[in-house]
UniProtKB/Swiss-Prot annotation:
Region annotated Disordered, chain positions: 1010-1066, 1143-1281
Compositional bias per record (Basic and acidic residues), positions renumbered to this chain: 1021-1030
TM region positions: 1075-1095
Membrane topology, as annotated: Single-pass type I membrane protein
Keywords: Cell adhesion, Cell membrane, Disulfide bond, Glycoprotein, Immunoglobulin domain, Membrane, Phosphoprotein, Repeat, Signal, Transmembrane, Transmembrane helix
Organism per entry: Rattus norvegicus
Domain Ig-like C2-type as annotated: residue spans: 21-114, 121-206, 198-305, 310-395
Domain notes: The Fibronectin repeats 5 and 6 mediate interaction with RGM family molecules.
Protein's recorded name: Neogenin
UniProt keyword Signal present: yes
């Protein structure tokens, strides 16, 4: 593969050239000059050696040696003196380009710069005499050539005119005078000075008139004009208005008012023109100039277009390549308008061909590299406002020299196993020199016959002996050679193989000039011409057409060049394409052409017509447009016709716009019934109207300035699980009532509230509890608020009451007689999405009574379902209002809803359906079917497969894979692998061999993360003979891109011993045997110590026990308050798990000596992995623990330990730091050491449960870490042997003992120490730091034997020995795990 911007592929003995910098420091820019002046076009380039600079004008090199007016400056710039420019001779104006060349290296070209020369001054408009009122605005025109505008200035009375905030010159040259004064009166003229003699315009007199009380019409003196500006320039939108009173100018952009005072880039110039500084793309749009003088408002608009010069998003990169390879120079540009791109090689334009192709819009692809392709390639982008260039260098590498090792011979039996029109498949056998060929790769070199440019295609993996060559030309001869490579290099090439691709079948090309046009609302005519490449006689054509938005395509056979399709839908868009047929079959299809049938009058009436009586003189009419299939065109309006019901001949008609779906009809008579109907309009005419719908205005206008009064009555009828509530409206009928609010609940009416329509007179409260006392309240409400409530109570019937017939409802005197007309279904059903499980359904009912005060017993049934799965059943609910809240829906699911009205025993049909899709929700189920398998041939790589969650609740946008070797670890300690949402499999590489891993997967969507899957265990396979490696290599692989998450930030590579990179590997068997021997020695030592301790404690005297029990804590928190002589002294060897060290009550020495104890560190230092041991292990960590330490220990145990370690390197580094201060026991008096306990102070703020014990340190450099507080009691806490450094096991009884440290203490001081897993007891147990215990000191042991007496009863001793036996079983389990 080609190398980009980096070091090239290196081979032994190969010398590789480096990229040579060659670039422009300064490039020429567009310049404007005048006749006779001098101009400099800057250019400077850098390279080593210095480049040679030349110039091109209009694509042709300039001969500067013999040119008197043009010369090359030392830095490479072009100097032109005495610019020549006339009507028939313009030798200096044009496009210039700087060319930099380095011999034997390459050439680059600069951007193109335009040199424009201002022409002779010509006035297109001149100032004219005018008058202006004091305080008003006026203009004086002076328009010249666009390139001469910068050279225009004005004079007043033959004196230079000074410009200020009140008098400005616009970019066009026009002079604007605002807020005119008498001093502005005079003669004005404009002058153009462009290098030659100045040119004067005609003089015009400006008269200033005094203010007048007459009204002067408001007019624009100058309107804004559309313009195009380049980003970063300034734009001035002119706008000057005049009138009496004087107008005020304001500006708007896209209907938003512009704030010209606070904006830093917007300014209002004299007269009202708008100036925009430093134009950006966001400034583009339509601007409105609005002039207002209080009597009249006028406006004018202009479009501002902002253009952006080309800018590179991605520039070409330098490339190393070898001959026959394919390369791609990438180039990505942006600009407005979109720039065009061309490529230049060493200053010459690259012409696209078979081997130089433009791919992916702007990239240059070079196929089959040859030595002459080497050089500099430049991407040149250009649009209307500028151009830019960026380049890169291509270096063709020499083939690597042959090595001394054996090279493969030529591949055998090279054949073309498959030959098609545009591809050839080659196969071969392995070389005779390497019959297996598993590690050989192959390169296929091929070229078109007669062409020197050769290309290469490599096999995808070692051992593969076939390749398919794509993108060939039909009926073309190609020459193929195959070459094998091994680790020493490329071998011999096979004999050339000559293969010719198959010729393509001669099929017709696309039919040109296909056109389609509508001839009527239901027909379209399509025409086309004969294909240019017919390849024989055209037999017939097939015309395909399809309605836009559908996927069903229809076709018809045609023998001519045109066809008219009838029976199409009105005002519907169709797409058409044509395929020509000859004797070989169908040819190439044409591009689709789209056309819409003509519009027609609507074929259906508007939908869901409803009437709302607003007051005594107005009615609001509502409707919905006809269905889209019946509109037959763009709805341009609606025609509303209405009349009094008593006089059918008197019809009033009004027309509204097509976007309006309601209309207020005013000026009606009081208490009068009116009929209404609506029809839709298109440009073709009026469609059918709806049926007449009636409504009656109120007799009088009702008051809504206050809340309604209390309802006149409230009645309740209790049933078993429901209560029927009925009421009558307030007595005062002159106050508007919008509805009623019913509150109810057991013992209180505020538990739930239901609102019903103002026309309703009863309601059934459902889903109540039997035999329960409910309090019910009723309030009328309107837009002002709720009125005074009316209270009632009722007790629902018990379950045993089977009388469910409600005679009160059946014989209700207020139930009206059913309307003999059939029930009409509800209309205007709409679904409003509220949340992920709630949708509100609303509708209208056209079958309500004509007047507003009559009520009946009708209710509505809402049904809904989803179509996934297809056999889902409908769900139903009843409602007595015109809306219903559907809850309990599934997230991200499309539902359909319909409504039916029921009154008495009659029901309507179901309404038209409405659809609504609930919002998304986070996944509520984890990914399922999680499986883990090992990748074949790669034991360190596994493949995780899964299926999406069953309850995704939305589109899955991604997954997160968690994995760890400790299933109980906190989730933030697991390693994560993100996966995109469309993937259901993922590879994880560089895992540790023969190690159990646990995997969890979590899905996410746009709302968040879902739950995790259950942990799936997978043990990586053991390494076979080919995969085995030294221990240091296995460990080192994690640091080279591996994914071992548990090493943590404290990991340090091995530095010495057997774990060093150069050490010999240690087999797992030797390591395990060494561990067993060490632990066994530790167990034997413990047994000996325990026997001695038991013997000593049996001789402890009663007097000595009382003396030890008298030890109190410093804060006086000792909880054993009995007589000291009743306290049995603790035997630390037996009561190990129930005692703790007591704090110092009083120190006999007022100035205890404190010493710093440095801790040497070697490979025996071991850090505990986790603090998740069970409770009895927690108790055994501290030999002295009583009731005082339970709280602190529980807090300590809850803290998180260090992250678990997956691998077990041992560290033999020298000490890194000193340990905290500890009291020295060597300098304390003997009496204090016998009667006092020591309180340990933790500098890290740890609890008092972290106690350390120490014994005398040996002088040997191999001593274990000793950071201990020596307890006054002569007995030591239990300790477990530690793992010694690599090498033969050594047991030194003189080594100091190290008790089991608490998790918190170890976390503070042993940061960089590595751990080794000891084993488990059938459950998760962390590795424990272990050391070899030492026997008690001789003096202490002698004192203990002298003071002790036998005081334990046989049964007590039996219990203690049983407990000791439990400890020994735990130790045995550790050694065998």
């Amino acid at each position: 593969a080609a190398a980009k911007n980096g070091s090239p592929p290196q081979s032994a003995g190969a010398s590789v050239r480096t990229f040579t910098p060659l670039y422009f420091l300064v490039e020429p820019v567009d310049t404007l000059s005048v006749r006779g002046s001098s101009v400099i076009l800057n250019c400077s380039a850098y390279s080593e050696p210095s480049p040679n600079i030349e110039w091109k004008k209009d694509g042709t090199f300039l001969n500067l040696v013999s040119d008197d007016r043009r010369q090359l400056l030392p830095d490479g710039s072009l100097f032109i003196s005495n610019v020549v420019h006339s009507k028939h001779n313009k030798p200096d104006e044009g496009f210039y380009q700087c060319v930099a060349t380095v011999d034997n290296l390459g050439t680059i070209v600069s951007r193109t710069a335009k040199l424009a020369v201002a022409g002779l001054p010509r006035f297109t408009s001149q100032p004219e005499p005018s008058s202006i009122y004091v305080g008003n605005s006026g203009i004086l025109n002076c328009e010249v050539n666009a390139d001469l505008v910068p050279f225009v200035r004005w004079e007043q009375n033959r004196q230079p005119l000074l410009l200020d905030d009140r008098i400005v010159k616009l970019p066009s040259g026009t002079l604007v005078i605002s807020n005119a004064t008498e001093g502005d009166e005079g003669l004005y003229r404009c002058i153009v000075e462009s290098g030659g003699p100045p040119k004067f315009s005609d003089e015009a007199e400006l008269k200033v008139l005094q203010e007048s009380e007459e009204m002067l019409d408001l007019v624009f003196l100058m309107r804004p004009s559309s313009m195009i500006k380049v980003i970063g320039q300034s734009a001035v939108l002119p706008c000057v208005a005049s009138g009496l009173p004087a107008p005020v100018i304001r500006w708007m952009k896209n209907e938003d008012v512009l704030d010209t005072e606070s904006s830093g880039r917007l300014a209002l110039l004299a007269g009202g023109s708008l100036e925009i500084s430093d134009v950006t793309e966001d400034d583009a749009g339509t601007y409105f100039c609005v002039a207002d003088n209080g009597n009249k408002t006028i406006e004018a608009q202009a479009e501002l277009t902002v253009q952006v010069p080309p800018e590179f998003l991605k520039q070409p990169a330098n490339i190393y390549a070898r001959e026959s390879m394919d390369i791609v120079f990438e180039c990505e540009v942006t600009g407005k308008p979109a720039p065009t791109v061309k490529w230049v090689k060493n200053g010459d334009v690259v012409i696209p061909s078979d081997y130089f192709k433009i791919v992916k819009e702007h990239n240059l692809q070079v196929l089959g590299l040859v030595k002459s392709d080497e050089g500099f390639y430049q991407c040149i982008a250009e649009n209307d406002v500028g151009n830019a260039q960026a380049g890169a260098q291509l270096i063709i590498l020499e083939h690597a020299p042959a090595t001394t090792g054996p090279l493969p011979s030529a591949p055998r039996d090279v054949v073309a196993s498959l030959v098609s029109t545009r591809f050839i498949k080659l196969t071969w056998r392995t070389p005779a020199s390497d019959p297996h060929g598993d590690n050989l790769t192959y390169s296929v070199f091929y070229t078109k016959e007669g062409v020197a440019r050769e290309r290469v295609e490599n096999t995808s993996q070692p051992g593969e002996m076939q390749v398919t060559i794509q993108n060939l030309m039909p009926a073309t001869v190609y020459i193929f050679k195959v070459m094998a490579q091994n680790k020493h290099g490329s071998g011999e090439s096979s004999a050339p193989l000559r293969v010719e691709t198959q010729p393509e079948v001669q099929l017709p090309g696309p039919a040109p000039n296909i056109r389609a046009y509508a001839t009527s609302p239901t027909s379209i005519t399509v025409t086309w011409e004969t294909p240019l490449s017919g390849n024989g006689e055209i037999q017939n054509y097939k015309l395909y057409y399809m309605e836009k938005g559908t996927d069903k395509e229809q076709d018809v056979d045609v023998s001519s060049h045109s066809y008219t399709i009838n029976g199409l839908k009105k005002y519907t868009e169709y797409s058409f394409r044509v395929v020509a047929y000859n004797k070989h079959g169908p040819g190439v299809s044409t591009q689709d052409v789209a056309v819409r049938t003509l519009s027609d009058v609507p074929s259906a009436a508007p939908q869901n017509l409803s009437l709302e009586v607003r007051n005594s003189k107005s009615i609001v009419i509502h409707w919905q447009p006809p269905s889209s299939a019946t509109q037959n065109g763009q709805i341009t309006g609606y025609k509303i016709r209405y009349r009094k019901a008593s006089r059918k001949s008197d019809v009033t008609e009004t027309v509204v716009t097509g976007t309006q779906l309601s209309q207020l009809i005013e000026g009606l008579d009081r208490g009068t019934e009116y009929n209404f109907r609506v029809a839709a309009l298109t440009v073709n005419g009026t469609g059918p109207a709806t049926d007449w719908l009636s409504a009656e205005t109120f007799e009088s206008d009702l008051d809504e300035s206050r809340v309604p009064e209390v309802p006149s009555s409230l009645h309740v009828r209790p049933l078993v699980t429901s209560i029927v509530v009925s009421w009558t409206p307030p007595e005062n009928q002159n106050i508007v009532v919008r509805g009623y609010a019913i509150g109810y609940g057991i013992g209180s009416p505020h538990a739930q509230t239901i609102k019903v329509d103002y026309k309703q007179r009863y309601y059934t409260i459902e889903n109540l509890d039997p035999s329960s006392h409910y309090v019910i309240t009723l309030k009328a409400f309107n837009n002002v608020g709720e009125g005074i409530p009316l209270y009632e109570s009722a007790v629902t019937r018990p379950h045993t009451d089977t009388s469910e017939v409600d005679l009160f409802v059946i014989n209700a005197p207020y139930t009206p007689v059913p309307d003999p007309t059939p029930m009409m279904p509800p209309v205007g059903v709409q679904a409003s999405i509220l949340s992920h499980d709630t949708i509100r359904i609303t509708w209208a009912d056209n079958s309500l009574p004509k007047h507003q005060k009559i009520t009946d017993s009708r209710y509505y049934t809402v049904r809904w379902k989803t179509n996934i799965p297809a056999n889902t059943k409908y769900k139903n609910a009843n409602a007595t209002t015109l809306s219903y809240l559907v809850t309990g829906l599934k997230p991200n699911t499309l539902y359909e809803f319909s409504v039916m009205v029921t009154k008495g025993r009659r029901s309507s049909t179901w309404s038209m359906t409405a659809h609504g899709a609930t919002f998304e929700l986070v996944p509520t189920s984890p990914p399922k079917d999680v499986t883990v398998v090992s990748k074949e041939g790669k034991p360190r790589t596994i493949i995780v497969n899964w299926q999406p969650p069953s309850e995704a609740n939305g589109k899955i946008t991604g997954y997160i894979i968690y994995y760890s070797t400790d299933v109980n670890a906190e989730i933030h300690d697991w390693v994560i692998e993100p996966v995109v949402g469309n993937r259901l499999t993922h590879q994880i590489q560089e895992l540790t061999l023969d190690t159990p891993y646990y995997f969890k997967i979590q899905a996410r969507n746009s709302k968040g993360m879902g739950p995790m899957s259950e942990a799936v265990q997978f043990r990586t396979p053991k390494a076979d003979s080919s995969d085995k490696m030294p221990n240091d290599q296995a460990l080192g692989s994690a640091g080279k891109g591996g994914r071992l998450p548990d090493l943590g930030s404290d990991y340090k590579p091995p530095m010495s011993g057997s774990n060093s990179p150069h050490g010999s590997p240690t087999s797992p068997l030797d390591s395990n045997m060494l561990l067993v021997i060490i632990v066994s020695i530790g167990v034997i030592t413990i047994v000996v110590v325990v026997i001695i301790a038991v013997f000593c404690t049996r001789r402890t005297t009663s007097h000595q026990k009382k003396k030890r029990a008298a030890c109190k804590s410093v804060n006086g928190s000792h909880k054993y308050k009995g007589n000291c002589k009743d306290v049995k002294p603790p035997d630390l060897w037996i009561h190990h798990e129930r005692l703790e060290l007591k704090p110092i009550d009083k120190s006999p020495d007022p100035n205890p000596v404190m010493t710093d104890t440095p801790i040497p560190r070697n490979s025996q230092d071991i850090t505990p992995v986790d603090n998740s041991m069970d409770s009895n292990i927690h108790q055994r960590r501290n030999s002295y623990r009583g009731h005082e330490s339970e709280d602190s220990m529980s807090t300590l145990a809850g803290r998180r330990g260090m992250r678990p370690k997956m691998m077990m390197p041992f560290d033999s580094q020298p000490p890194q730091q000193s340990v905290r201060n500890t009291p020295s026991t060597d300098t304390m008096p003997a009496s204090s050491s016998q009667t006092c306990c020591t309180d340990h102070q933790d500098p890290e703020g740890a609890t008092s449960s972290s106690y350390l014990a120490s014994s005398q340190e040996e002088d040997s450099g191999q001593s274990l870490p000793t950071a201990h507080v020596r307890p006054s009691h002569p007995l030591k806490s239990f300790a477990v042997p530690a793992i010694p450094p690599p090498g033969p096991p050594i047991y030194d009884p003189a080594l100091p003992s190290t008790p089991l440290l608490s998790q918190q203490a170890l976390n503070h001081h042993l940061h960089s120490v590595k751990t080794a897993s000891i084993g488990t007891l059938g459950r998760s147990r962390p590795p424990m730091p272990v050391v070899v215990p030492s026997a008690p000191e001789v003096q202490e042991a002698t004192r203990m034997l002298e003071d002790s007496e036998s005081s334990y009863e046989p049964d007590e001793l039996t219990k203690e020995m049983a407990h000791l036996e439990g400890l020994m079983k735990d130790l045995n389990a550790i050694t065998t795990a």
